Every structure is written in structure tokens, then in C-alpha cells.
Amino acid sequence: MSAKKPMALVILDGYGHRETQADNAITNANTPVLDGLMANQPNTLISASGMDVGLPDGQMGNSEVGHTNIGAGRVVYQDLTRITKAISDGEFQQNETLVNAIDKAVKAGKAVHIMGLMSPGGVHSHEDHIYAAVEMAAARGAEKIYLHCFLDGRDTPPRSAENSLKNFQELFAKLGKGRIASLVGRYYAMDRDNNWERVQKAYDLMTEAKAEFTFATAVEGLEAAYAREENDEFVQATEIKAEGEESAAIVDGDAVIFMNYRADRARQITRTFVPSFDGFTRNVFPAIDFVMLTQYAADIPLLCAFAPASLENTYGEWLSKEGKTQLRISETEKYAHVTFFFNGGIEDEFEGEERQLVASPKVATYDLQPEMSAPELTEKLVAAIKSGKYDAIVCNFPNCDMVGHTGVYDAAVKAVESLDECIGKVVEAIKEVDGQLLITADHGNAEMMIDPETGGVHTAHTNLPVPLIYVGSKAVEFKEGGKLSDLAPTMLALTDTAIPAEMSGEVLFK
């Protein structure tokens, strides 16, 4: 069998690009190898943060998200950004599960109930999503739109719900239909420790309008709770109903949409709407269409608007299906990233996949040994390149990230310099076997060691772009505007391997 010419991906963890030289451990390090590559090899900058990696706009990237996106060959959206994006591009408003539930209730002259954590917190839900659901129900002809508000005060300040409630009151006034039907603190509605007596108060409130208190408006109900010394999280079951208004309890034929996207605190209240539930005795059990925004648990037999995104045909799985061999190699600190996260959350190796782990040094903090285990890792990586055994190799050098996190500038510079030496050996090996190499990063860190705003030590990741360098015999010219999820399709194209349909990332050369 002839020796394989590997396609290698080397991820320099935490190696971001920043124009400013001040406090930049990367540009201030002595790096003849990387400087030479940047001067003489095809290279570009790619995005590793925010919506480009499925995070909220402007949010810095991290290693888990970065490696997941690289391996998937598509942007992997977190639930918050997935729903936000679906709303902005109209996919939410056309979602078949939501459309069917709303339309069925409208046709029967029934109500559409929307429940969820009314908060801009963004941890379990986002009120912008709930706003969109109300507008969607109204646009599809629902006359009775009832909003059941779970109040936050944990992921938001303890008494901050008034603004949210006013916004929804204004929305209903503008629509000329619908109203806030109930208030209850998340302590009751979103318990996750089997305190069913709490959950029952929220269930009875929504299904029977059974409440400790009734007020004409939501803001009045909230003010009364504050007067009772109850912060948002602990607001007792409160019915909102002005004189002459009909009850907004959930009844047969209604549609109920639960707008929380995070599962752990949504499961219990959702299970109370399942026929087989026995956590407490329900006085009423309405026959309804109940829609979970995301799948709270695989064993909850209710409708789900946004099923879990499948990460089928990641780079590793696809290479395996194509009968190719691959190696994943890193030291302890980033081993999980080049294996579990790179494989889309799959623990086991694919057929043809091998793994090598180099132990990270046993030091209190990595500024004490900025080169970490890079020399040994490089030795093993070079041997793997020359072995002729592997079609593809993925390697992570953790130094810039792990030493960057210590905040010790001089150590970060040393980390970069030790990497430069290592990269020189890797490039030499690749050229020797006529292989191909992409050098990049999963996010930035070491390029900003002092916070420009506070003047204090900067130990966090950045939201800056990362370099992408090609070494190999192909005449490659990069396109601008790439992101981490473009790397897998690019590597497949470089090796003349078919690209699976699931990979929506782009090939990064012209």
C-alpha cells in the first residue's frame, strides 16, 4: 500500500489576529516561521465568534463551540441564536408545527395560549421570541391570545419584570386583541427538583384560573406582589382579569405554545400536560395541542417546533464513510476538543479514526511552563505525518489559550515563540511527504493581554478573527469572509473528496 499524503489541520488554540501591537503576545513574539508563512503562503482571516459560530452577535468564541463548528462543516446554532435567526428570516413564522397548532385553534374559534419565562435574560427564553409568537398568532387570525407569564429575577435583576409586562400590554393594545392572562414566579412554574406542589400552583393557574390573587392588569398584579415582599422569581399565582373579561383558563381545543428553549426547567411543567402524568392529581386535564419550542426530553410525547439539529456527516464521520484514515492528536487540555467536540458530541472513534493523547505538564499554572507539552506533541505529530498511515490529521496546540488565560504577558510571548519552532518542524514534515496543511485557530486570546477599556489584565477569549494559512503544492487563492464552519468542506475539496450535503460551509478558495 502506498504511503498516504496527509491533509493536516493544526489548530493553534487562542491564536487570534489583532492589528494593534500593544499588549499583543502574538505580534510581539519572535516568530520567523509564522512570519515567513504569512509572507509567502496563501492566507486569510476567518471569523470565529458571534453568529458566525452560532453564538449571539458579538459574543466571543470558545473552544467547544469552535471545534464543533470546524468538525461539523456548518454553523451549529445554540438554541437562543437558532430561534432568533428563525424569527428574523421568517422560518419561525412558517414553522409547520406552530402554524398547524395555531390554525387548528383559530378554525375552531378557540384560544392560543403562549407561556414562558418573560425575560430578556436569554438563558431559558427570550422575550423577543415570545413577542414574535404573539404577533404570529395574531397574524394567523387568533382572536383569543392569552399570555401566561413566568417571571424571572434570577437571570435578570430580582425586580425587573415591570418593563417586560408593560411592553406586552402595549403590544396587545396595538394588536387590538389578546391579553396577559396570568403571572407566576419561575420558582413555581420552572421547578426542576420534583417539587410538584410548586408546579401544581402554576398548572392550576393556567388550567383553572385558580389563583391566590386576581388583578385587572399585570402591572397591578406585580406591584401587589412587591408590596407582599415577593421578588419576580417568587410571585405567587396571580390571575389577570378585568371586570367583565372572560376566563383565560386553558380548555379543550385550545393551542398551548411553550416558548422556553432550555430544557432543564421546562420539563416538569410540560409533563403536567401529558396524559400519563401522575406527579399530582389534576382537577382538569384539557384536550389541547401543546407545542414545545424545542425538545425538552425525548420521552415527552408532545409536539415540538424545533427538533434537535442533527449533526450527521461531520468531517470525521464522512472521512470514515469514505474509507479514509484519520488521526486526532493533542495534549490533555484540548484532547476532548479534537475528539468529542470535533465529532459533534460523539464520544466513540469512527472506523479508521485513531487518537493520541500527550499529557499536559503537571504545573500549578501554565505560565510556569509556557511551552507546555508542545515539543513532545510536535514529535508525535511529525512522526504521524511521515508514517504514511493517515489521510487526515487534526492537531490542537493549547498554548496560546492556556497561557493566555493566566494573564502573564511574558509567558504568553514565550508560548507563541515555542509554537513557532514547532510549526517549523510540522511544515518541514508536510513538505517532505508532499502533504497539505491548514493552520488556523478556534478563537482568539493571546493577542489581547491587557483590557483596552479597563487597563486591567485580560484573561478571556476575544471576538477577533483568526488566521488561516495553507501549506501545500496546490495553487490556492483564498476568498475573504470565511468562518470556522468552512474549514471541513475546504479540506475535503483540497483532497478531492466529495462534500456531504449536510455541510453548508463554503470552500474557501476561489
Curated annotation (Swiss-Prot):
Record: residues binding Mn(2+) 1: D401, H405, H461
GO terms, molecular function: manganese ion binding; phosphoglycerate mutase activity
Cofactor note: Binds 2 manganese ions per subunit.
Annotated InterPro entries: Alkaline_phosphatase_core_sf (IPR017850), BPG-indep_PGM_N (IPR011258), Metalloenzyme (IPR006124), PGAM_B_sf (IPR036646), Pgm_bpd_ind (IPR005995)
SUPFAM superfamilies: 2,3-Bisphosphoglycerate-independent phosphoglycerate mutase, substrate-binding domain, Alkaline phosphatase-like
EC number: 5.4.2.12
Reaction it catalyzes: (2R)-2-phosphoglycerate = (2R)-3-phosphoglycerate
Keyword Ribosomal protein: no
Residues at which substrate binds: H124, R154, D155, R186, R192, R262, A263, D264, R265, K334
Keywords annotated in UniProt: Glycolysis, Isomerase, Manganese, Metal-binding
Cofactor dependence: Mn(2+)
PANTHER family hit by this protein: 2,3-BISPHOSPHOGLYCERATE-INDEPENDENT PHOSPHOGLYCERATE MUTASE
Function, as annotated: Catalyzes the interconversion of 2-phosphoglycerate and 3-phosphoglycerate.
UniProt-recorded name of the protein: 2,3-bisphosphoglycerate-independent phosphoglycerate mutase
Record lineage: Bacteria, Pseudomonadati, Pseudomonadota, Gammaproteobacteria, Vibrionales
Gene of this entry: gpmI
